[in-house]
Amino acid sequence: MTQSFQVGDLEVKGFSDGILKTSIDFVVGMDRAQSEGLVGGTDNGALFIPVNNFLFEKDGKIIMIDAGAGNTMQPTLGKLPGNLRAAGIDPSAIDYIVITHIHPDHANGLVDDAGAAIYPNAEILVHAQEFDFWMAESDGATPVKVRNTRARNRINMKPYMERVRRMRDGDEVLGCTPMLAPGHSPGHTVWRIGTGRKAFVAWGDLVHFSAIQISHPQTAVTYDLDPDMARQSRLRMLDMVANEKLAVAGAHVNEPGFGYLSRKGSGYSFEPAA
Ligand SMILES: [Zn+2]
């Protein structure tokens, strides 16, 4: 069943791409006993996190946030197109895809196994800083992780190249405004969507392990290309979200993936939307 929440005049629906198996070993700067305790224990460190996508309509257009992993990562992922169809939404009906960052679990699902667009009519909204970094040429000094993701991102973006809108902070399309929150990736973006206080943020991977990083926002993960910068972005953005009482749609926040932050101790707690 599709879950939805209301933010002002927007009805935001959550669509799962599936479950990503990861590891508590990827937590940086917290001892193992504490991180195990926060997630309620693991079997040999295995941690299972959701890959959430969101969709809403505005002015007769259908806008989706991120595109899932496709068939490229784990068999438990790549469920997004099927879940859209099950809800009566043909992927060809999607007009815009807002991208938080161009990592495999958010962008590899843009294309099918043959490299054809799964969303043939969608325009991509992405921060220029993120797009330019991943579309740049690699050289001998480029870390392997970056080189591989760049190579894959050429495949992801190829059928969309004529309809990519490179945006910067302050730009707006249908109420969607990017706010640079770098660190996890160089142009990682928190999108503010809606009007005034009747807005929500799609915060991408600002928080990767929600059971740990919302209550302990100083804690980074090895997925962050620059963990210190990611930490600063997280602290700054969580503060803003809590101050403004904005609703949150989190790419890897445990079910239902959306809700509100409140301050608790030196961190925050997450109240799921009803
Ligand atoms: Zn992610």
Labelled PLM ranges:
Residues 97-107, 181-188, 249-256:
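Histidine-centered catalytic micro-motifs
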Residues 2-87, 190-205:
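Conserved beta-strand hairpin/beta-sheet module of binuclear metal-dependent hydrolase folds
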Residues 63-65, 98, 124, 200-202, ...:
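Residue-level marker for buried hydrophobic side chains located in beta-strands
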Residues 196-274:
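Cap/insert and terminal regions of metallo-dependent hydrolase folds
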Residues 75-125:
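Active-site metal-binding motif and surrounding structural segment of the metallo-beta-lactamase
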Residues 17-19, 67-70, 102, 129-130, ...:
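Active-site metal-binding loops of divalent metal-dependent hydrolases
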Residues 37-47, 88, 150, 221-234:
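A short acidic, glycine-rich active-site loop
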